[in-house]
């Protein structure tokens, strides 16, 4: 439509099969894994700030207040040939997956995210708490958060179809939230 040229959205999707977690990501929505109580960022933002940090031109702290902090370098819809980055890792029972928009990761620091993921046991309540923390920090963007716990392999097999359906619905909601908020 008119005025939509160059517009796009971000997307981070996860697929868990057994102990193997595969992440597909375009844009600056992130995936994190809480493994043995330590938070690790699984994805790299497709953003001007990430490029500048990697090049040593900015610190992560400087990037948070930079006037171009919202500029993304890759998005769905902006180029028909856009390809996602793929990440693969193994997970264990007890790990916790977090997928979030930049409305979370741009407002609160990773140590606060890690603390909340460890402290709030219920995944839905944890996601709500993270959203509330981002808003309390002055959230100026949409805040979308999904928290999922890794359970035993036998349980994953039994619930495979139900989880795929729920994950698909959740990912569609993330995409819609990014479209509406962006």
What are the language-model segments listed below?
Residues 1-182:
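PP2C/PPM-type serine/threonine phosphatase catalytic domain
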């Amino acid at each position: 439509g008119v005025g939509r040229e160059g517009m796009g959205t971000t997307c981070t999707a996860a697929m868990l099969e057994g102990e193997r977690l595969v992440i597909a990501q375009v844009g600056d929505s992130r995936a994190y894994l809480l493994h043995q109580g330590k938070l690790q960022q699984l994805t790299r933002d497709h953003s001007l700030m990430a490029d500048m940090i990697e090049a040593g031109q900015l610190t992560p702290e400087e990037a948070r207040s930079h006037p171009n902090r919202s500029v993304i370098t890759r998005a769905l819809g902006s180029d028909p040939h856009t390809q996602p980055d793929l990440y693969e890792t193994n997970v264990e029972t007890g790990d916790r997956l977090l997928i979030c928009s930049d409305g979370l990761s741009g407002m609160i620091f990773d140590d606060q995210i890690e603390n909340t993921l460890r402290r709030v046991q219920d995944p839905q309540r944890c996601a709500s708490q993270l959203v509330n923390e981002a808003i309390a920090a002055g959230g100026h963007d949409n805040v979308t958060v999904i928290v999922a716990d890794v359970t035993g392999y036998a349980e994953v097999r039994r619930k495979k179809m139900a989880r795929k359906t729920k994950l698909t619905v959740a990912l569609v909601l993330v995409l819609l939230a990014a479209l509406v908020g962006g």
